[in-house]
Swiss-Prot record:
This is Fusaridione A cluster transcription factor fsdR. Residues 1-30 are annotated as: Disordered. Its main location: nucleus. Transcription factor that regulates the expression of the gene cluster that mediates the biosynthesis of fusaridione A. It is found in: Nucleus. GO terms for biological process: DNA-templated transcription.
Length: 520
């Protein structure tokens, strides 16, 4: 475990108290060449709302988002907000980005509740204000508030049709956190306990987002917790960070996110990194599944594949889906051959441990789709956030139906897949020209192949099989005719697919071409 940065400068900074008049970490990064100075001119794409409007939006942010994204200290943020609307207005680029990100997030929530395109455009206008200030942060602003600002605008983009900026912004936030040293325990005596706690909190928010996004996409995380670890801010239990479940139980959502992020880091390290042991995959999978089960017992004891779950706080629903996605990623590692090999053995001929892994994948996929059915249709940003998780569930259930079409649960599974395809179709029609168009093509083709396999197992002639997705029945007759008669000409290139969307095939799927070759 790292005990601190190795440079001589860092050793001096840790042992020398800060004095007024000395250079601060902020001032070291201020130099720029005159040719690029115009880039840092403050650009206002959309004027800020009135004081009343801004106060209302910021208050809503801390009421609805703070539990899942406790990146800011509410009293301090409100104090800066008051200064923004007074003669003491700060010119900090980090504050400008943070404020507009908070306004954008809160305004988007209003827009979704009202189903108003005009209100949504206003949210994007505030987001453009925030983006206009990111250059200044990335090139000239190295302080804690800069990390907070990057995380805030990244949080906005996570729930959009293009999550690519969120990957880059979170990565930059982690690197900026490294540059100011919040990835290690500070030895600076001038840092107050409150500031030290906030530094820990911001660090762990960056880690939670980094680990979550990387596990979804198969990319390596920006920070290795084995190389730099800071104890979580366990004493942070103020009531603004407590979430109540529908059953009345109280939960610190942030603490549960931290513990899951630690497990997610172990998943990548033990199963996917160059450090992963090559010959003991079964032991690693068993250990990771036990860690996930321990997490579930502590933070989500009612979350089982046979339990009835109700719609919870959006942060809690996201946490549940992240948990099930982690179960899939871990279990899939032990049963990969079954999912992707064209010469797979029969399910009954597999070792019991591999059969258990397959069942884990199936149960988690069913739970993911059941949870998705509870999400209100107005939560569009939430739906965009979980596209890759839903796609993983669809891929697993469809492959299982292709592999074992006589499975007694196959019909119900395909009904659930149809529900997800309807969600995809609704989102794609609302926005269009997004990576979801390609996701739909992949999922719909697997869906049709699964239906064909199920109907063929009943000894129906191939010519008489109708493989049009029920989720697409409201399409025009021309589209239905095309789906029936041109499916055999569809070709799928996974490499080309990944180049057209921000997410690769979920969980690093490397599907062999046999799954995509024509069958009808």
């Amino acid at each position: 475990m790292s005990t601190g940065p190795p440079s001589g400068i860092s050793l001096v900074s840790m042992t020398t108290p800060r004095k007024s008049g000395q250079h601060t970490p902020e001032s070291w990064s201020k130099w720029t060449h005159p040719s690029i100075e115009p880039l840092f001119t403050k650009r206002v794409m959309k004027p800020l709302p009135s004081w009343t409007g801004a106060f209302s939006l910021v208050s809503e942010f801390f009421t609805h988002e703070h539990q899942v994204f406790p990146c800011f200290n509410a009293p301090a943020f409100m104090c800066l907000l008051g200064q923004q609307y007074s003669v003491e207005c700060t010119e900090s680029p980090a504050w400008w980005v943070s404020l507009n990100s908070v306004l954008a997030i809160a305004q988007r929530r209003r827009a979704e509740a009202a189903q108003s395109a005009e209100a949504e455009d206003l949210a994007w206008a505030y987001a453009s204000n925030a983006l206009a200030g990111t250059w200044d942060i990335l090139m000239r602003s190295t302080q804690l508030s800069s990390v907070q600002a990057l995380l805030a605008i990244a949080w906005f983009f996570i729930g959009t049709p293009n999550p690519q900026p969120s990957f880059m912004l979170v990565g930059c936030a982690v690197r900026l956190a490294h540059s100011i040293g919040i990835h290690v325990e500070s030895q600076d005596p001038s840092i107050s306990p409150a500031e030290a706690n906030l530094r820990k909190k911001v660090f762990w928010i960056a880690i939670c987002l980094d680990q979550e996004l990387c596990l979804r996409t198969g990319r390596s995380p920006c920070h290795d917790l084995n190389a730099g670890y800071v104890d979580p801010p366990m004493d942070s239990l103020d009531e603004t960070e407590i979430t109540k479940t529908v059953d009345g139980h109280e939960l610190n959502l942030f603490q549960s996110q931290i513990q899951l992020a630690v497990i997610q880091g172990a998943i990548y390290r033990d199963l996917h990194s160059g450090k992963a042991p090559p010959n003991c995959i079964a032991d690693s999978v068993a250990d990771l599944l036990q860690k996930l089960e321990n997490w579930r017992i502590e933070f989500a004891p009612t979350l089982t594949h046979d339990s009835t779950v109700r719609c919870e706080h959006h942060g809690l629903m996201r946490l549940y889906l992240s948990y099930y996605n982690a179960v899939i990623v871990v279990s899939r590692a032990h049963s990969l051959a079954y999912w992707v090999s064209p010469n797979h053995p029969a399910f009954s001929a597999l070792p019991s441990s591999m059969r258990d892994s397959i069942e884990n994948c199936l149960n988690a996929s069913r739970c993911i789709i059941e949870l998705s059915k509870l999400i209100p249709v107005t939560w569009r940003s939430f739906h965009w956030d979980i596209i890759s998780i839903l796609m993983s569930a669809v891929v697993i259930l469809c492959i299982m139906a292709i592999r074992n079409p006589m499975n007694e649960l196959a019909t119900n599974d395909m009904g659930s897949v149809g529900d997800v395809l309807h969600i995809f179709k609704t989102l794609d029609e609302a926005y269009g020209n997004t990576y979801l168009t390609q996701v739909q093509k992949v999922c719909e083709k697997l869906y049709r192949k699964a239906h064909y396999a199920m109907q063929s197992s009943n000894a129906q002639p191939v010519e008489s099989v109708d493989v049009v997705s029920p989720a697409l029945e409201d399409s025009s007759n021309a589209n239905q005719q095309q789906a029936r008669h041109t499916d055999s000409t569809l070709e799928f290139n996974p490499n080309a697919f990944e180049q057209t969307m921000p997410y690769p095939l979920p969980m690093g799927w490397d599907l062999d071409t046999f799954l995509w070759t024509p069958t009808i």
